């Protein structure tokens, strides 16, 4: 199991396109989905039936660290983070060089808010296995959220150089390119992420924003609509769809989409501002 298997979705809190776009101002500082993580919690993985089956495997081989790593991943996918942490601890105690378990435990530490412990575990994982792409991607996400952008970029770049098939590496590097106004590079990375994870909404939303930044409104609209089709609970995508309607002068449709974005995420300020603009008059 790698770190991807226990990634959860976090709230979409990126910089959506704002009113500045409506007046034709540059988009260089805008970006989308800074979490860079687009895998849902799967409660079924943490179900009593599934855990019971995995526990039976452990009972048959209590000294096998892999059993604890697998069950820990199931707990993590089910959102049971303390139970996951305990299993990864046991896996590492049984095999101090279990680099996958370090990377998985790091992800759980991130979800529990202990970023220092997470960083230490990611560092240990890549120290044991310098070719483990999932640890570089996880550490890169940690760095990016901490504002350590160059270090984040280096980790995503390393994972890509290792020929990772994990879409997060390309998605996250694309987010960095996007935040720097390098939209052609961002579009290329988002496109690769889409080819690797065609059912993930976030790369479509990200690519749509970069298309919009390059004034390719038709492709932007198509991508953002696809993001909504894949994930109807993506508040940022609804807000971005509304922005395009607003740019086109269709205030009624814009207000409807902004309203849906606010319903999904009442704290998402770009949607709240957009709804205020389009609901007046």
PLM features per residue range, with description:
Residues 2-3, 31-39, 45, 221, ...:
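Terminal, low-structured helical/coil segments at or just beyond the last alpha-helical repeat
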Residues 4-17:
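Bacterial N-terminal signal peptides that target proteins for export
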Residues 17, 21-86, 93:
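N-terminal leader/linker segments that initiate helical-solenoid repeat arrays
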Residues 44-53, 79-90, 111-124, 146-158, ...:
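Structural signature of tandem alpha-helical TPR/SEL1-like repeats
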Residues 65-66, 99-100, 133-134, 167-168, ...:
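Helix-start (N-cap) detector for alpha-helical repeat units in TPR-like alpha-solenoids
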């Amino acid at each position: 199991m790698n770190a991807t298997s226990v990634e959860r979705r976090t709230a979409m809190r990126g910089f959506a396109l704002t009113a500045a776009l409506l007046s034709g101002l540059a988009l260089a500082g805008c970006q989308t989905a800074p979490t860079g993580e687009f895998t849902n919690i799967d409660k079924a993985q943490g179900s009593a039936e599934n855990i019971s089956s995995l526990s039976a495997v452990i009972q048959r081989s209590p000294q096998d660290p892999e059993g604890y790593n697998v069950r820990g991943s199931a707990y993590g996918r089910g959102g049971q983070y303390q139970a996951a942490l305990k299993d990864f601890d046991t896996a590492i105690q049984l095999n101090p060089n279990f680099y996958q378990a370090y990377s998985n435990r790091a992800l759980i530490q991130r979800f529990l808010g202990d970023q220092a412990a997470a960083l230490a575990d990611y560092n240990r994982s890549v120290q044991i296995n310098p070719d483990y792409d999932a640890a570089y991607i996880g550490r890169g996400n940690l760095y990016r959220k901490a504002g350590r952008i160059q270090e984040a970029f280096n980790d995503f770049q390393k994972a890509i150089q290792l020929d990772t098939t994990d879409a997060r590496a390309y998605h996250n590097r694309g987010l960095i390119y996007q935040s720097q106004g390098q939209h052609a590079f961002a579009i290329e990375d988002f496109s690769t992420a889409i080819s690797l994870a065609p059912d993930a909404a976030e790369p479509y939303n990200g690519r749509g924003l970069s298309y919009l930044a390059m004034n390719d409104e038709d492709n932007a609209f198509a991508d953002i609509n696809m993001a909504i089709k894949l994930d109807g609970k993506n508040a940022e995508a609804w807000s971005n769809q509304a922005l395009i309607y607003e740019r086109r002068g269709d205030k009624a449709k814009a207000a409807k989409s902004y309203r849906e974005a606010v319903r999904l995420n009442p704290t998402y300020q770009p949607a709240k501002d957009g709804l205020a603009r389009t609901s007046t008059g």
